[in-house]
Amino acid sequence: RVLLIEQGNLGGCGGFTRSMYEALQLEGVTNHVLMDDDAVIDARVLRNLVSLLSFTGDSKVIGGHMLDLLRPHFLYEAGAVVKSNTRLKSLHHNIDLRAVDALIPFNKYQEVDYNAWWFCAIPTEQIRKAQLPAPIFIRGDDMEYGIRLKELGVKTVAMPGIAVWQTRKEPAEHLNMVQDVFFSSPKDVLEL
C-alpha cells in the first residue's frame, strides 16, 4: 500500500518532517520515501525500490541518484561521504553515463554517509530511533539527519537503478559555502 502526502514546498523541517510524523502515526508503515516536489521520476523506479526493500527490510536507508534533468544522461550525484567531519564529498558527480567506463564504479556495493532527500527511503523504525529532523530550515537539513542516522549505525546505500531527474543543484561539498560563515559542521546547527 502506498500513501502519497502532498504539500507545499515547506523545506525539510516543514514538509518532510510533517510527512515523517504522519508516517509514524500510521499502523504498519515500514518505509518512508522522501522526494522533492520538483523531481521527475519514472514509475519503474518505485517498482525497483519496492523490490529492493523486500530484501533490506528496515535495516538500510536507500538513496536515489540524481540525474540532471537538462542533460538526462548525466549523473549529478550518487550520495556523499563525510570528509574531516566538517565537509561532504559528492560521489560520482557530473558523470556522463553514456561512457561505458563511467559505469564500472557501479558494479560494486557502495555505502555512503548521506543521501539527499531528492529521493530517499528511510525505514520508519530508523526514523523512530533517530527521531524527527531538527525543527529548523537551513540548507543541508537533510545532511544533518543523514549524519545522525550514520552515528546511530544505520547504513545508507545509493543504488543504481533508483534515481530521479532534477534541475542541477550544488553538489554536497558546496552546501557548506554559506554555512561556513556560521557553522563549522552540520551538527553545529543543533547547538544554536
Question: What are the roles of these predicted feature ranges?
Answer:
Residues 93-120, 173:
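A recurrent flexible, glycine/aromatic-enriched loop bordering the glycosyltransferase active site
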Residues 175-192:
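Catalytic core of nucleotide-sugar-dependent glycosyltransferases
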Residues 115-119, 124, 128-147, 153-162:
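Donor nucleotide-sugar recognition loop
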Residues 18-19, 44, 48-52, 145, ...:
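Alpha-helical scaffold elements adjacent to nucleotide-binding pockets in ATP/GTP-utilizing enzyme cores
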Residues 2-14, 22:
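Conserved donor nucleotide-binding strand/loop of the catalytic core
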Residues 27-40:
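Short beta-strand-to-loop acidic/aromatic patch adjacent to the donor-nucleotide binding site
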Residues 159-175:
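Active-site donor/metal-binding and catalytic loop motifs
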Residues 25, 44-90:
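Conserved donor NDP-sugar-binding/catalytic core segment of glycosyltransferases
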